[in-house]
Amino acid sequence: MKLLRYGPSGQEKPGILDADGRIRDLSAHVPDLSGDVLSDAGLARLRAIDPATLPLVSGEPRIGACVGHVGKFIGIGLNYADHAAEAGMPVPKEPVVFGKWTSSICGPNDGIDIPKGSVKTDWEVELGVVIGATCKDVDEARALDYVAGYCVVNDVSEREWQIERGGQWDKGKGFDTFGPIGPWLVTRDEVPDPQRLDLWLEIDGHRYQNGNTRTMVFTVAQLIAYLSSCMTLQPGDVITTGTPPGVGMGIKPSPVFLKAGQMVRLGVEGLGEQLQHTRDAR
């Protein structure tokens, strides 16, 4: 299934794509795509519904983040060896974990706000993993059983705040609009191998990032097992699993960063695309 949330920010309704790619409304069956709705049992109930029997959503509504009420938005850094090299950092021996504030979450096509005074706002196309069941201390072999589905994430980052101003990375990762998620939550059964997905990103039509999740340092299963050893993962938590090379700060001889008035387009194989316009923060 391809699940989504549509409508004005803060008033999103749950939906599903039918066989023709049209949005059907699910709000008579579930209040949101969150919590127990994301469990195997909850998704099985949705799967039993014939989308053709659901109300058709007219027009072209805004698409919101594909998960509601996210509890934890967990980032993984330097998870592609070639990205670590372009960043001038060693390949990590353990996952680099940071937090993205849930207030950064927005829809896949919402605008990206360039923070006041920022000259180092950067892009990162990533595979997002949505947890569907509570897990603690899970084995790598069973880790994917706890996944509800997958989505596209743009881990927008302000490099000065992330790297140059001391402290943790979180500061540069959590500005408002720095967490576009979606358009769809593609359920686990439709993604047979999360380690075989192409991902890409373009700025104003120029392709900067081309990668595949097979080159991750730590696989999705390894990340879930690792994270569950130091925290309890809960339904609706989102893990964004790192980016391939081609980010702005790694461009030689001179880095390239986002500025207002640009168009960012990105996607992950089978999970849809995002399209964002950049603007100065108000």
Curated annotation (Swiss-Prot):
What EC number(s) is this enzyme filed under?
Answer: 3.-.-.-
A GO term for molecular function: ureidoglycolate lyase activity
Alphabetically ordered keywords of this record:
Hydrolase, Magnesium, Metal-binding
Which residues of this UniProt protein bind Mg(2+)? Answer: E124, E126, D155
A GO BP annotation: urate catabolic process
List, alphabetically, the InterPro entries matched.
FAH, Fumarylacetoacetase-like_C, Fumarylacetoacetase_C_sf
- What superkingdom does the record give? Bacteria
Look up the record and name the cofactor or cofactors this protein needs.
Mg(2+)
Pfam families registered for this protein in UniProt = FAA_hydrolase (PF01557)
Record's keyword annotation contains Hydrolase: yes
The entry sums up its family as follows: Belongs to the FAH family.
Kindly provide the name given to this protein in its UniProt entry: Putative hydrolase Bcep18194_B0137
